[in-house]
């Protein structure tokens, strides 16, 4: 189940995008996740690293192409992430993982335009809001889920 957390922090996908992710939206051979009908009904492509790819390959094994990867609706996914955080003693929400993704990328040297594109933001100003959070406390929170 925690593959969904890993996917969120490694892709910056929105809660609804994670919930609606189909097996056919993952291009394993190209190391890409295709977000279909994201916010504003826009599609985007997000690269994925080898670690996430291997976790998703394992999770998707035996599933049909039109099957959801995680099997949650958006609202229940948000509640599940909160529940996992509560279990670990960390107040966390699905959207916090998106903030973590953006902040972590910037701290590791990505430029703001790259982060904007990965998050699927139309406006650079929206991306700048995401970067106002400090990653340290979010990273500590994620480690508690390990």
List PLM regions with ranges.
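C-terminal catalytic core of tyrosine-transesterase DNA break-rejoin enzymes
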Residues: 6, 10, 83, 98-122, ...
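Short, leucine-enriched amphipathic alpha-helices that occur as contiguous helical runs
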Residues: 1-2, 74, 78, 98-99
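Basic, Lys/Arg- and aromatic-enriched nucleic-acid-binding interface segment
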Residues: 1-15
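DNA/chromatin major-groove-contacting recognition/catalytic segments
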Residues: 47-50, 133-146
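Conserved tyrosine-mediated DNA breakage-rejoining catalytic core shared by Y-recombinases
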Residues: 11, 20-55
């Amino acid at each position: 189940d925690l593959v969904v957390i890993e996917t969120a922090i490694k892709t910056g996908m929105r809660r609804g995008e994670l919930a609606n992710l189909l097996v056919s939206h993952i291009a394993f051979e190209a190391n890409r996740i295709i977000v279909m009908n994201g916010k504003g009904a826009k599609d985007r492509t997000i690269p994925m690293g080898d670690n996430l790819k291997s976790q998703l390959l394992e999770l998707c094994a035996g599933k049909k192409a039109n099957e959801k990867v995680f099997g949650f609706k958006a609202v229940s996914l948000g509640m599940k992430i909160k529940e996992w955080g509560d279990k670990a003693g960390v107040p966390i929400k699905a959207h916090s993982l998106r903030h973590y993704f953006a902040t972590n990328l910037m701290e590791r040297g990505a430029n703001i335009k790259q982060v904007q594109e990965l998050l699927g933001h139309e406006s650079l100003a929206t991306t700048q809001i995401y970067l106002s959070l400090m990653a340290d406390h979010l990273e500590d929170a994620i480690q508690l889920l390990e």
